[in-house]
Amino acid sequence: MAREGKINRVNKAWLGEKACEVEINDLNEPIGKQDQYAAAFGGLNIFRFNRDDTVNVEPIHIDKDALTQFSKHMRLYYIGNQRSASSILSMQSKESLKEDKIESLKTMVSFVDDFAKSIISNNWKLCGDIIDENWSLKQSLADGISNPGIKQIYSLGKKHGAWGAKLLGAGGGGFKLFFAPPEKH
């Protein structure tokens, strides 16, 4: 509690780390740090999660027009299917020790810089392609990330012109992000 006349300030990194401590350590959730840091920092950033538990944050600098164009290519839909993120993430964590899963994760990490460059250069088609390839790899990480209904929604979006699509969060349901030319919305 702040004393009278004193203002307590917290920085974004502290807020992200405290959110992780609560979910990971206190609640014992088998999750990563991405969501907490994204919420704490806001905006467009590259987050690099290091082996020593530190996090490097690199803002992606684009002008307002580019940000508007980037946003215009995205559509987010709630597709239902409430699920337990913990069970999917727990399974994914166990599976990620397998060599083929490690390679998929390394490939997904390798997309980060190319995705940032595609945003900076306004290469929206490449953004969609990277999102799509990322989703393809994500589905291979564990059972339960996708299902026939999610695959059907994905196929429908692609059929109607989406360059890429992915499920947000752990998988199994929730929100589906499509990245497509605005005229295809």
Indicate where each model-derived feature is located.
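C-terminal nucleotide
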Residues: 3-30, 34-167, 177-185
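Glycine-rich nucleotide-binding loop
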Residues: 171-173
